[in-house]
Every structure is written in structure tokens, then in C-alpha cells.
Swiss-Prot record:
PANTHER family in the cross-refs: PHOSPHOGLUCOMUTASE (ALPHA-D-GLUCOSE-1,6-BISPHOSPHATE-DEPENDENT), PHOSPHOHEXOSE MUTASE
GO MF annotation list: magnesium ion binding; phosphoglucosamine mutase activity; phosphomannomutase activity
Lineage: Bacteria, Bacillati, Actinomycetota, Actinomycetes, Mycobacteriales
Name of this chain's protein: Phosphoglucosamine mutase
Cofactor(s) the record lists: Mg(2+)
Phosphoserine modified-residue sites: S104
Note on cofactor: Binds 1 Mg(2+) ion per subunit.
Species name: Corynebacterium glutamicum (strain ATCC 13032 / DSM 20300 / JCM 1318 / BCRC 11384 / CCUG 27702 / LMG 3730 / NBRC 12168 / NCIMB 10025 / NRRL B-2784 / 534)
Keyword Cytoplasm: no
Coiled coil: none
Active site: S104 (phosphoserine intermediate)
Length: 447
């Protein structure tokens, strides 16, 4: 049986894969698993539910809420709000679980559901497996009378609580910094510009008018050209691009050059080391982190640890090791002292705080690492499980690694959210990386 949960919750085409009946069952099962030990002294468990603006979000929120209420859980709906805000509010309200309805950077027709446990933590695999196990075994009858959960619509103070949290996390004045923010017509459309303005920055917001259908449409972190053009047009000091649920952030310097998650981690790691905030002098990245990040961290006397792709795995390593900074090349940056998951708005504030504290431009700060040429090809496949062990693929990888030697690397991995196999090659020369990646992709496509 195919596992329902991927690397970032349950995701699929809304109303075809991710249906209202499925959301109802998921809500009930998750409530049963996550609140089983919280029902003491007549206490009623509480869940926080947020969503991004896509049109299917209201339908799925209603179904999820009904499922949780059917298990005796009180549901507090917090409306359109970023994923990291749901994680924060789960802890801040003292709730027993949280749910975010979003498909992140995926197109509008998709949607997704991700759960948080008490404290705002993403679920480990074994808990997700338990939710799947009980989905079809819960009795049809649930609590009755006073035991039925309530649904509290749109808590009015949720956004203000989150904005105050961001202000406390990064109190540095950003006065004098001019920024363009691309909110992807998503969950950050109000929060991000408001947070940056509250910190003192001059803000030009683009793609910040969601209409239920335009989320991620030619905008946001997957269409970085939009913020690049706007930075040049307005003469801004930098640009920030968020994704649909605002748990990631990519940056652009004043000349329109991309500053990706690896570069952001490099500049923040060096800053935190200087300030005595980088615990154990360690940064946590993933296997997709550019080789240039490893080289830069070695030069700075910082240890780089790597995990599987997915900010949940970065988080697990951060928590297990007691580290204070981690993230992904895609722009998921995690600062455990201020949050339990990637937070695009917090990342943006942290970048600008470093600019304000040093008086340096983002372009200057980004020179903390040299990005090696990297080519990534996504290959559609029907069966991801057999690719990496197939003899022809094994032979092709060995040939590529022999050609690259110590000057580059090869990584093949299955996507956790789509029917794709990702072929990544890094090399000292872009053309060499492109040629080797193309060769490997062709082999994968034939398997």
C-alpha cells in the first residue's frame, strides 16, 4: 500500500486525491492519535487550524475541523496565515495539535495537510504511520452531547500574536533598508509586508493580493525573476520571495542576483558564530546543499552536518543535537530559538538585521560562500523505488563520479511529493555539470 504521508504531510490534487471525505477521516484519526493522552480531568483537547488562500482550503478546513470535533477536540480556526504561524500558535495557545492546509509552492489546484503536535512540532514518521493505521479502524460513533468538540471560527488575535513574536525574535531596526517582497499571492500576503514595515523597512509588496486562484501563479519563490525585475525597477536594497505558505524565503541582492538558501545559511551561520549564538559551531543542511557551502563552512571553522531533504529532517537533527541553525537550499531556514519550523518572514527579518548590523549590502554578505555550478533535472518516473539500484543507473553514477573526481559530486534521489526522480550534478564547470546531468537523466528515463 502506498504511504499517504510524503515528506511534508499529505498532498495532492484537491477534490480528486485530497478529497473532503479523506480530510474528514484524517482529521478524526489525527485527533485520536495526537490527543489520546491529553484527555484527563475532563479537559477537552484543542487544535489550531490555518490555511493558505487557495480555493479548496475552506472546503478542506471544514472537513478537517468536523473530523477533529467528532473526536471531542475543540478547533480554533485562525484563517489565512503562514505555516510557521500555525506552528507558533499551536504552542502559544497551549493547543494539543495544529494543522496547516497548504500545498506550499505547488499550483493552485493542489492542496495539502500537515500536522503539528503540541509545542508546534512536525510529526515523526512513526506518528504519521499510526494516523494512517487508525484511519479506517475508528468506530463510526464518537463522543456525544457535551463530549462533541466545538469549532471556533477565525480567532481574531492570531495574526497579531504571530507578528509580536516576529518583533521579539528580531528586534533590530531596519530603518533605511528598502525591500521588495513577493508574497506569491499566498499566506504571507499580509503578514510579511506588515512585519517588515513594523521593523522600519521601506516595503514594496508585489503579488500580495490573493483571490483564491492566483497563489504561486508566475510569482513567489518558484518565479524569482519577478522579484529580480522589481528590485531593479525600484532601486531596492534587496528582494525577498516567499512560497505559498511562507515557510521559505529566497533573496535577491540590489543587482538582481539570486541569494539562495545555502548562501543565506552561510551568512547567518557566520553572523551567529560571531555573536556566540551558533551552538556547537554547527550548521545543519541537507544532501542537496551546494558543495560550496561545505567549503565555506570549513574555512569559517563551522561544522556542516547534512540530512535527507525535507525541513522536518533538518529539524530532527537540530533538536537531537541541540544546534541553532539549519535549512535547505530551497530557502527553508530554521532558527530553533525562535520557531519549530522553517519561517520565511523570520528569515527575511534575520537577513536584513545582518545588513543593518554590519552596514554591508546583501551582495557583500552573500560572498561568504562561492556557489559551485549545480544542475538539477527532474525526471518523471512511474516507479521511484527501483531507480537508484538499477544496474544501468549504478554504472552511470560510477562513470560520472570517476569523471568528476574531487571537484564535484552526483546525487540522485526520489521526490517526496511528486512522481519525479531528481538528478543533481555539481562541478567546477557549468557545462560539465550540464553534460553529466543530462547523461544521467537519460539513463534514469529509460529505466
Amino acid at each position: 500500500m502506498t504511504r499517504l504521508f510524503g515528506t511534508d504531510g499529505v498532498r495532492g490534487l484537491a477534490n480528486e486525491v485530497l478529497t473532503a471525505p479523506l480530510a474528514l477521516k484524517l482529521g478524526a484519526a489525527a485527533a485520536h492519535v495526537l490527543t489520546a493522552e491529553k484527555r484527563v480531568d475532563g479537559r477537552r483537547p484543542v487544535a489550531i487550524v490555518g490555511r493558505d488562500p487557495r480555493v479548496s482550503g475552506e472546503m478542506l478546513a471544514a472537513a478537517l475541523s468536523a473530523g477533529m470535533a467528532s473526536q471531542g477536540v475543540d478547533v480554533i480556526r485562525v484563517g489565512v496565515i503562514p505555516t510557521p504561524a500555525v506552528a507558533f500558535l499551536t504552542d502559544d495557545y497551549g493547543a494539543d495539535m495544529g494543522v496547516m492546509i497548504s500545498a506550499s509552492h505547488n499550483p493552485m489546484p493542489d492542496n495539502g495537510i500537515k500536522f503539528f503536535s503540541a509545542g508546534g512540532h512536525k510529526l515523526p514518521d512513526h506518528v504519521e504511520d499510526e494516523i494512517e493505521r487508525v484511519m479506517d479502524s475508528l468506530p463510526a460513533e464518537g463522543p456525544t452531547g457535551h463530549g462533541v468538540g466545538r469549532v471556533i471560527e477565525e480567532a481574531t488575535d492570531a495574526q497579531d500574536r504571530y507578528l509580536e513574536h516576529l518583533k521579539e525574535a528580531v528586534p533590530t531596526s531596519l530603518e533605511g533598508i528598502k525591500i521588495v517582497v513577493d508574497a506569491a499571492n499566498g499566506a504571507a500576503s499580509v503578514v510579511a509586508p506588515t512585519a517588515y514595515e513594523a521593523a522600519g523597512a521601506t516595503v514594496i509588496a508585489i503579488h500580495n493580493k490573493p483571490d483564491s486562484y492566483n497563489i504561486n501563479m508566475d510569482c513567489g519563490s518558484t518565479h524569482i525573476d519577478q522579484v529580480q525585475a522589481a528590485v531593479l525597477k525600484h532601486g531596492a536594497d534587496l528582494g525577498l520571495a516567499h512560497d505559498g505558505d511562507a515557510d521559505r524565503c529566497l533573496a535577491v541582492d540590489k543587482d538582481g542576483n539570486l541569494v539562495d538558501g545555502d548562501q543565506i545559511m552561510a551568512l547567518l551561520a557566520i553572523a551567529m558564530k560571531e555573536n556566540g549564538e551558533l551552538r556547537k559551531n554547527t550548521l545543519v543542511g541537507t544532501v542537496m546543499s551546494n558543495l560550496g557551502l561545505k567549503i565555506a563552512m570549513d574555512e569559517a571553522g563551522i561544522t556542516l552536518r547534512t540530512t535527507k531533504v525535507g525541513d522536518r529532517y533538518v529539524l530532527e537533527d537540530l533538536n537531537a543535537g541541540g544546534f541553532s541553525l539549519g535549512g535547505e537550499q530551497s530557502g527553508h531556514i530554521v532558527l530553533p530559538d525562535h520557531g519549530t519550523t522553517g519561517d520565511g518572514t523570520l528569515t527575511g527579518l534575520s537577513i536584513m538585521a545582518r545588513m543593518a548590523e554590519t552596514g554591508k549590502s546583501l551582495g557583500e554578505l552573500a560572498q561568504a560562500m562561492t556557489v559551485l555550478p549545480q544542475v538539477l533535472i527532474n525526471v518523471p518516473v512511474s516507479d521511484k523505488s527501483t531507480i537508484v539500484s538499477h544496474p544501468s543507473v549504478v554504472a552511470a553514477i560510477a562513470e560520472a563520479e570517476a569523471e568528476l573526481g574531487a571537484t564535484g559530486r552526483v546525487l540522485l534521489r526520489a521526490s517526496g511529493t511528486e512522481e519525479l526522480f531528481r538528478v543533481m550534478v555539481e562541478a567546477g564547470d557549468k557545462e560539465q555539470a550540464r553534460r553529466i546531468a543530462g547523461r544521467l537523466a537519460a539513463v534514469v528515463a529509460e529505466v
